């Protein structure tokens, strides 16, 4: 979808200044489908396929393809692209050494999904090896293979392919078709709604009461809220995206103003890179048209690998460069005395009266077959989660 000059001028500037679109038109798609059978080919795992999609639709603007070695090294070591633009996570295409040896620089490489469907074409400009231990240590802050993101690093091929991509076809996301909007479409949506300021919220968990509290606090000072849940690959013990999406529908319908909230999927894989992933999440939401982004406790964290507010500390160092306003919230809790949600800034009562909420605790209770108290979750949401996980 092409944006008009008026929309471009009246929505936040994309990261790097231009909203990238690498999706081919119908004529070129037909040509690429015909010639792809004669191209060397590789099969993308779900993680790489989601990266391909986000490059193609502009979610990862200004990237036009998978990173070359110069950009990769600069991102890993200094959180910037070679051109000086802030970028925190390497977006790369790994293959085995044997596969890399079959491919020649200058070739067009057909990119298939695990369903044997053609999704894209890579114009191969570069092949390079990388240090897995270094990538893990710099990006994830640990080399412990118990960390799900680090494990992915060690499992993937030892060579990266680089070059611009063409998005030939899109993963369907059939379950979420009503909520599948590209960055150009969300920008059009915000313009049509006359939202000058929009706060984005990233989540891979159901919306519990602490989430609701900080979202509504943010909504007091902006025109609209974009609830933008990640629906790509996550850990096996995370709540399935389809169940989460139903829970989002229920809570928005019953507890949020319809004219000031929108639900749109974020079709990315979860990296669990904590502070660095918080920067990526903010960057992507800027590309989707958000002017503000919420960073709460342990953003994009897993286990005890990151401190409670490490993500807030790191992203604050790059906020001016990012060009999106970061809204930092303390850990919210339910106070039995206040009989309401609060934070340490607003509640005077002893910690023994505080019920701390988290996605982990919600998952644990559901896994153990426990009911979710009203202080934890809206009853309609709890019903959806319990039913969905029983069916799973």
Curated annotation (Swiss-Prot):
<dbReference type="Pfam" id="PF14306">
    <property type="entry name" value="PUA_2"/>
</dbReference>
<dbReference type="Pfam" id="PF01747">
    <property type="entry name" value="ATP-sulfurylase"/>
</dbReference>
<keyword id="KW-0548">Nucleotidyltransferase</keyword>
<protein>
    <recommendedName>
        <fullName>Sulfate adenylyltransferase</fullName>
        <ecNumber>2.7.7.4</ecNumber>
    </recommendedName>
</protein>
<dbReference type="InterPro" id="IPR015947">
    <property type="entry name" value="PUA-like_sf"/>
</dbReference>
<comment type="similarity">
    <text>Belongs to the sulfate adenylyltransferase family.</text>
</comment>
<keyword id="KW-0067">ATP-binding</keyword>
<keyword id="KW-0808">Transferase</keyword>
<dbReference type="GO" id="GO:0070814">
    <property type="term" value="P:hydrogen sulfide biosynthetic process"/>
</dbReference>
<dbReference type="InterPro" id="IPR024951">
    <property type="entry name" value="Sulfurylase_cat_dom"/>
</dbReference>
<dbReference type="InterPro" id="IPR014729">
    <property type="entry name" value="Rossmann-like_a/b/a_fold"/>
</dbReference>
<dbReference type="InterPro" id="IPR020792">
    <property type="entry name" value="SO4_adenylyltransferase_pro"/>
</dbReference>
<dbReference type="GO" id="GO:0005524">
    <property type="term" value="F:ATP binding"/>
</dbReference>
<dbReference type="GO" id="GO:0000103">
    <property type="term" value="P:sulfate assimilation"/>
</dbReference>
<dbReference type="InterPro" id="IPR002650">
    <property type="entry name" value="Sulphate_adenylyltransferase"/>
</dbReference>
<comment type="pathway">
    <text>Sulfur metabolism; hydrogen sulfide biosynthesis; sulfite from sulfate: step 1/3.</text>
</comment>
<dbReference type="InterPro" id="IPR025980">
    <property type="entry name" value="ATP-Sase_PUA-like_dom"/>
</dbReference>
<keyword id="KW-0547">Nucleotide-binding</keyword>
<dbReference type="GO" id="GO:0004781">
    <property type="term" value="F:sulfate adenylyltransferase (ATP) activity"/>
</dbReference>
